[in-house]
Structures are given as structure tokens and as C-alpha cells.
């Protein structure tokens, strides 16, 4: 008896219908039925066939007459034509996509509402918990997951940046434990200057692994994640990096189509729109592009504006399976009225805004002051996999940036009167026209070897870079505060501290550049080798050494020229022991060096720069660091918790003694770094840390400096971002940030000035309306806390005021 849905062959066996056979189910992928995704489909089809056959055999006999079905007539099949090269590439691309889809599905243990990871998800993050990032971008130099890496690395995914409402890199300095904001030369309040673990890192910012020496204002609309490497990193990154380095990972083109638009409105006339679109053009080529528009004032500050626009474009081309070529280009343009902050009330040892002056008081001039920061950079990279053991990569970068401003410094205040309404200050001009041009090339050969049960990932690399900076100023509109005060033409004395009376005065001077810029050029040729040896995922040894040939020149249009060279050799070594698969204990040691003149944005020696007319050339500062730590992946490996003890020492540190620059100082920083990122439960996610430090000047040409702590850093800091998922698509969250006092000075904390400690609280509530639309209400600085970003190094400094309370409504559309 023949059953419906089955037929007999010549031997009377029951067979599955053709539509349920594995071969038919696989034809939409390719004609050969290969790959893990195909295997899964085959298994499913096979189970369906077995179920169908079993069901058929279990049916009771029917009394209906049998139906005879003639077997189809066999016909000769035409010979398959040989596929073209384009068809082969398309087939390979589909096979890769199927494998990637299968891997993504397997990785999502707790997907949102049972779905898969978002199409625009961070490729480096835990698919089930985007607060937890598993790997950093530099996969060759850091081949192991963060759990197995003997170094403290803080990684903020774009989801963390969004929930912190971090739209500019500077906000990371306000809300990250162990990182402090600083002010630059001449009170440059606009460049991103960071201190990591107590050391200046303003020239240790990288974009996709290539140094970005612009010291400009950096937006985050093109950012996938931000990586903070803590501790010396010269063997990875080259010169500097005494306290660590920051790497900005840009958004790259992918294989999944998506569209996302974020629209934001807020207090202080905030209007912001960002766009992010990824489109697969063909199986081998995809494009990702995005844009930014922002028009805004600054919360709690009068007249200050923060307008931005930008765009990025990224492409990925895989002409064959083993070759990937990527490009990206980013443009950002920021403008507005600059803000140099408020004067310092020396008698009360606080900024004037903590002594009764309104926090929004601005001392600039609307008819003169302006600020522009513009940056363009493009990167082309190729990755070729020779075989399973050898991969070659090469990157090329070109960059041009501009930082152009005239601002007003509120300096030399007269605050002796007991009545704050009678206090006065001098509003002095500060200006800069700075351009930065960079050409760089990185080449890596990565080798994966298995020697007697030990798996090696070794990297041999070279790097060549050319950096050129030109720094000019506007005629009569420059003032270096340290010392005798301002003599600039644009200075106005007798400005009332409580109510500046000259904000709208006209200026008869038309700003013009001096035309005699200070120019710096740095050529660096580097070679490095690194190896990570993993024995049964129990013992992991990591080490590397790097040589940098550093060649620096400084000149002006006047007959002033300086040239110097330095040969830098630095190394690192780390050992990891894993008592359990989810935990590691490690010890690490590393060195780094700061060559003379390596802070290219500075024209003064107190900031690490070298004037073209200097007669003194000093050797590199030498840094050594030891770290002992442990890391654990908890909650089904969706929560990474780490703790580390560290000590970093600097020798040959530069300082000015009796007006003469010397290199006889030394200091030490010790501390503990505790961090947690990921989920505590399926609904509750956290990201944050606690850093406690002690610093001490151990050598100095100024006897009174010995034993003092270091200036410009917060020795205790804490931050914690928390988010909880409710039912019906609701989420609530917030952030708490603490920073201890910051003491003023150039090197040692010897001025007696200080900024008070503070707590800052943020909060947000988010509602997913449907699968495409989400709305978020965000409150930043919820209690409207008056706190300060940084203070200048002089005896009577000015102080940068942090933003006040602000509310934002953010609408996100995803398609």
C-alpha cells in the first residue's frame, strides 16, 4: 500500500519526499553542500525526513484501493558548465556568510527577546552582553581574549558610549576611573589632554592602531569602541605611553545590511542627528557610511557653543577568500565660542564660582573669539592569508587636522576685597593656528604555530611614520600665563568678575597670523617582534620587544633650527596562569620611553616640547612598570571582573630648576585598579571601576619637591554605569562618578591650589516602542553639581568649569 507523501523504490523501501531531502535543501547555497551551516541544514532535513517516514510507517492500513504511480522516465542531464570566476567568488562569499551566520547564532546565549544580535552589533563584544568586550582590535598583538591578556585594558563599546551619553572623547576623561583631564600649553582647553594612571597621555591617542598626534577635539559618531591600555605600552605602540594609551576603533563595513538614525533634542538648545548605514553591494563588496549634525550650547555656561558636523565612509572588498581590502575616511568639523573657564579665588583656595560667582559667567568677547577644530583622515588596509599559519597585513594612513582659535583667559584676578561684587580680573587673549599632517605605514606578518602542545601567535612588524606640526598665533593675541602675566594687545583689565562688562564690545583689531610658525617634524622607523605562547590554555607567556628610530627637528622662519635623534628599545613580558577556564592570574613587566620633544603640540619645555632656539638637548625619560592581577569571567562568562596592583616609575624626568631645564627628577605611582563589565543577571548590566593611587616625587633638583605628590591628577576615582531591563521593552539606568581632589602645579603639587572632589550622577530611561523604534530620556549631571575639569599650572590659575545639568530626548530608528 502506498502512503501519501511517500513512494516505493524497486525494493519496496519507503523514501522521503524529494523536497525534504538534504540535497534539495542545500541547492540554494551551492551545488556541493559544504560548510558548517550546510551541515546544520542537512541534519534538520534528515530529522524531518525520518519523522515523515516514521509517521508514514505508523499509519494503520487503509481499505482504499491501491493507486499505481508510474516511475518518471529517466532523462539524460545536461553537462554542467564550468562556473565563471565571478560565480566562484559569489559562491565563496555566500559560503562565508553562512558560516558567519552560524557562528553568530551559536554565540548568542541570551539574545534580546529570543532574537539574534543586532545587525550593527560590535564585532568585538559579547553577542549576549554588549557591555562586555572580549577582544581588542589589534588581534595580532593581542591574540588572546582579554581574560588571557596580562594587562589591564578598559574597553568601552559603542553601547557603553551611548548609555554614558559620550559624544566626544573628552567626556571619557570625566567619567572613567583612572583617567583625568588636563589643560594644555597656554591654557589650551580644547585639545583632548588625558592623564592615565597619573601620566600625561595627550600624544598617546591612536585611531585604529595608528598614532594621532593632533591633540584636537575628537567626536565619537564614527567610533565602534574605545580601548584604554593601562600601563607602559611602548613595545606595542612606540614612544611615550608611560601611563597607557587610548585607541579609537572606527566603524567598519560589514556583511549585514542595516540603517540607523539617532535624533536628539535637549536643553541648552541641543539638536543632534547621527546616521549609520551599512549596505552590501555584492557578495564581495560592502559599504558603510554615516553622518553627524549638532547645534548646541553648553549646559551651565553662558554664550559657549558646541556645533559639529561630520561624515565617514568605509568599504570592504574580498575579491577572494584569503584577501580582504578595507578603506575608511572620516571628516569632522567642530566650531563655536571657546571657554577658558573662570578665575581662581586664591584667598579661599577655590574657583570663584565656588565663592559666589554665578557658574555660567563667561569672560570672552563675542565680537572676536572663535574656535574651529577640523580633522580629515583616511586609511587603507589589506589583509592576506597565505595559509592557516601565516597572515600578512598592511595599513596606510594619511591625516590632516586644524585647530584654530582665539579665546580669552581670565587671569591675574584681584580678589582681595571682601565683597565679591568688587573683584576684577584681566581678560587676556590666547590664540593658536595649528596644523598637523601625518603619513604612516604599518606592516605585520602574523605566524600561528603549534610546537609540542604550545600554540604560538608571533608577530613581526615594521612601522614608518612622518608627522609634521605647524603652530602659529595671531598677532598681539597670545599670552602664556606662567610668569609675568599678559602683555597681549587684546588684553582688557578691570573686568568685573561677577558681571563682565565687555562681552559685547567691538574690537578694532582684525586678527592676522604672525606668519612665523614653529614647525616640528618627526620621522620614526620602527621594527618589533612579539610572541604569545599558550600551553593548553593553562599557562600563557606573552612578550615583545620594539625598536624606534626617532628623528625630530624644530624650526621657524627665523634662523633657528634644532635637530635630534634617539634610539629607543623597549620590551614587555607577561605570564598568565589559569587555574580554571574562567579565571586567570598574571604578572607583567614593561618599559617605555619619552624622547625629548615628543609632545609635538607644545612649544614650551614644561609641556614636553622643544623651542627651536633651545640650547639644551636631553635624553629620553625612562618608564618601568610592574603589574600583578587577576581576571574572572562570571555569570556564564558574561561578566568580566578584574583587579590589579601596579607600580610605575619614571627616571630622567624633566623639570625646570632655577630657570634651567634638567633631567634629574624621578617619581613613582602605585595603585590598585578594579574593574567590572558585563551582566550580573539576564536583566542587569554594569560597567565601571575603582582606581586608588599614591604618587611621590623621589628625586628633584628642587629640594622642597621631594616627597610631594604629583600635580594634575585625581588619586582616587570611581565610576559605575548600571542598566536594568524591565518588561515590555523598558530599561532604566544611570551612572555614578567620583573624583578626588586634584592639586595644581607643573610637576609636583607645589602651588597650594586644588580642585574639590565631587560626585556626579546621571540617569536614563529607555522604551523600545517596536522592533524599529526606541526612545530614551537622559539626564546628565542630575543634581546640577558644580565641578571642574582641570586647572592651569600657574600660582593663580584659571579653571575649566564642567557642564551643568542637561536633559536629552533621543529617538533611535533601526531598519
Give the positions of each predicted feature.
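Face-selective signature of the C-terminal outer-membrane beta-barrel domain
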Residues: 378-400, 429-555
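Outer-membrane beta-barrel translocator/receptor signature
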Residues: 222-224, 235-311, 319-323, 376, ...
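Membrane-embedded beta-barrel scaffold of Gram-negative outer-membrane proteins
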Residues: 383-387, 391-397, 401-407, 585-586, ...
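Acidic/polar loop-and-plug regions of large Gram-negative outer-membrane beta-barrel proteins
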Residues: 294-299, 311-318, 322-385, 400-436, ...
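Gram-negative outer-membrane beta-barrel transporters
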Residues: 642-649, 662-747, 783, 812
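Structural signature of Gram-negative outer-membrane beta-barrels, strongest in the C-terminal barrel
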Residues: 316-320, 436, 455-467, 518-650, ...
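Acidic, small-polar-rich N-terminal luminal/periplasmic segments of exported/outer-membrane proteins
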Residues: 72-256, 628
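C-terminal beta-signal and adjacent terminal beta-strands/loops
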Residues: 738-747, 766-815
Amino acid at each position: 500500500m502506498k502512503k501519501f507523501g511517500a513512494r516505493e523504490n524497486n525494493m519496496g523501501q519507503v523514501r522521503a519526499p524529494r523536497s525534504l531531502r538534504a540535497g534539495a535543501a542545500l541547492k540554494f547555497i551551492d551545488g556541493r553542500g559544504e560548510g558548517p551551516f550546510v551541515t546544520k541544514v542537512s541534519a534538520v532535513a534528515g530529522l524531518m525526513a525520518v519523522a515523515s517516514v516514521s509517521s508514514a510507517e505508523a499509519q494503520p492500513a487503509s481499505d482504499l484501493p491501491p493507486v499505481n504511480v508510474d516511475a518518471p522516465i529517466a532523462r539524460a542531464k545536461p553537462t554542467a558548465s564550468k562556473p565563471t570566476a565571478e560565480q566562484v567568488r559569489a559562491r565563496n562569499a555566500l559560503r562565508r556568510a553562512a558560516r558567519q551566520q552560524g557562528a553568530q547564532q551559536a554565540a548568542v546565549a541570551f539574545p534580546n527577546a529570543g532574537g539574534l544580535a543586532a545587525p550593527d552589533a560590535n564585532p568585538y563584544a559579547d553577542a549576549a552582553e554588549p557591555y562586555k568586550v572580549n577582544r581588542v582590535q589589534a588581534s595580532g598583538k593581542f591574540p588572546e581574549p582579554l581574560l588571557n591578556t596580562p594587562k589591564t585594558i578598559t574597553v568601552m563599546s559603542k553601547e557603553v558610549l551611548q548609555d554614558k551619553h559620550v559624544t566626544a572623547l573628552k567626556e571619557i576623561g570625566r567619567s572613567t576611573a583612572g583617567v583625568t583631564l588636563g589643560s594644555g600649553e597656554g591654557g589650551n582647553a580644547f585639545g583632548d589632554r588625558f592623564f592615565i594612571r597619573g601620566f600625561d597621555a595627550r600624544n598617546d591617542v591612536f585611531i585604529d592602531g595608528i598614532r594621532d598626534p593632533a591633540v584636537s577635539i575628537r567626536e565619537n559618531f564614527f567610533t565602534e569602541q574605545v580601548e584604554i591600555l593601562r600601563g607602559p605600552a611602548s613595545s606595542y605602540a612606540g614612544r611615550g605611553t608611560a601611563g597607557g594609551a587610548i585607541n579609537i576603533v572606527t566603524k567598519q563595513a560589514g556583511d549585514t545590511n542595516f540603517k540607523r538614525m539617532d535624533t536628539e533634542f535637549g536643553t541648552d538648545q541641543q539638536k543632534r542627528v547621527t546616521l549609520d548605514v551599512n549596505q552590501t553591494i555584492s557578495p564581495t563588496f560592502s559599504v558603510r557610511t554615516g553622518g553627524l549634525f549638532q547645534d548646541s550650547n553648553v549646559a551651565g555656561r553662558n554664550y559657549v557653543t558646541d556645533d559639529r558636523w561630520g561624515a565617514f565612509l568605509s568599504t570592504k572588498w574580498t575579491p577572494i577568500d584569503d584577501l580582504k581590502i578595507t578603506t575608511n575616511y572620516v571628516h569632522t568639523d567642530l566650531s563655536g565660542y571657546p571657554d577658558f573657564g573662570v578665575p581662581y579665588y586664591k584667598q579661599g583656595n577655590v574657583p570663584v564660582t565656588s565663592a559666589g560667582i554665578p557658574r555660567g559667567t563667561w569672560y570672552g568677547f563675542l565680537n572676536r573669539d572663535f574656535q574651529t577644530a577640523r580633522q580629515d583622515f583616511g586609511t587603507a588596509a589589506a589583509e592576506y592569508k597565505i595559509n592557516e599559519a601565516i597572515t600578512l597585513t598592511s595599513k596606510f594612513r594619511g591625516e590632516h587636522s586644524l585647530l584654530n582659535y582665539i579665546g580669552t583667559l581670565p587671569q591675574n584676578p584681584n580678589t582681595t576685597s571682601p565683597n565679591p561684587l568688587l573683584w576684577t580680573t584681566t581678560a587676556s587673549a590666547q590664540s593658536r593656528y595649528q596644523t598637523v599632517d601625518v603619513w604612516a605605514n604599518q606592516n605585520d606578518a602574523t605566524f600561528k604555530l603549534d610546537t609540542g602542545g604550545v600554540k604560538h601567535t608571533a608577530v613581526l612588524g615594521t612601522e614608518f611614520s612622518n608627522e609634521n606640526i605647524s603652530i602659529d598665533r595671531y598677532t598681539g593675541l597670545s599670552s602664556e600665563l606662567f610668569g609675568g602675566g599678559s602683555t597681549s594687545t587684546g588684553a582688557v583689565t578691570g573686568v568685573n568678575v561677577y558681571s563682565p562688562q565687555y562681552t559685547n564690545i567691538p574690537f578694532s583689531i582684525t586678527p592676522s597670523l604672525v606668519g612665523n610658525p614653529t614647525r616640528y617634524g618627526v620621522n620614526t622607523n620602527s621594527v618589533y617582534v612579539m610572541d604569545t605562547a599558550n600551553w593548553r590554555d593553562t599557562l600563557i607567556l606573552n612578550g615583545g620587544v620594539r625598536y624606534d628610530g626617532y628623528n625630530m627637528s624644530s624650526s621657524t622662519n627665523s634662523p633657528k633650527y634644532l635637530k635630534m635623534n634617539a634610539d629607543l628599545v623597549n620590551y614587555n613580558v607577561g605570564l598568565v596562569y589559569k587555574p580554571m577556564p574562567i579565571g586567570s592570574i598574571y604578572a607583567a613587566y614593561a618599559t617605555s620611553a619619552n624622547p625629548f620633544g615628543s609632545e609635538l603640540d607644545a612649544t614650551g619645555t614644561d609641556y614636553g616640547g622643544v623651542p627651536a632656539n633651545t640650547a639644551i638637548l636631553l635624553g629620553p625619560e625612562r618608564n618601568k612598570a610592574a603589574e600583578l592581577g587577576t581576571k574572572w569571567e562570571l555569570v556564564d562568562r558574561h561578566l568580566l571582573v578584574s583587579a590589579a596592583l601596579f607600580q610605575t616609575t619614571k627616571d630622567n624626568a624633566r623639570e625646570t630648576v632655577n630657570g634651567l631645564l634638567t633631567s634629574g627628577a624621578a617619581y613613582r605611582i602605585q595603585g590598585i585598579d578594579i574593574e567590572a563589565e558585563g551582566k550580573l543577571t539576564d536583566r542587569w548590566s554594569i560597567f565601571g571601576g575603582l582606581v586608588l593611587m599614591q604618587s611621590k616625587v623621589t628625586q628633584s633638583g628642587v629640594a622642597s619637591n621631594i616627597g610631594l605628590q604629583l600635580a594634575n591628577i585625581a588619586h582616587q576615582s570611581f565610576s559605575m554605569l548600571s542598566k536594568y531591563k524591565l518588561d515590555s521593552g523598558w530599561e532604566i539606568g544611570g551612572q555614578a562618578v567620583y573624583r578626588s581632589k586634584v592639586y595644581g602645579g607643573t610637576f609636583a603639587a607645589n602651588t597650594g591650589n586644588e580642585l574639590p572632589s565631587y560626585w556626579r550622577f546621571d540617569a536614563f530611561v529607555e522604551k523600545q516602542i517596536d522592533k524599529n523604534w526606541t526612545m530614551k530620556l537622559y539626564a546628565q549631571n542630575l543634581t546640577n553639581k558644580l565641578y571642574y575639569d582641570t586647572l592651569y599650572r600657574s600660582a593663580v590659575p584659571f579653571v575649566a568649569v564642567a557642564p551643568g545639568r542637561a536633559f536629552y530626548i533621543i529617538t533611535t530608528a533601526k531598519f
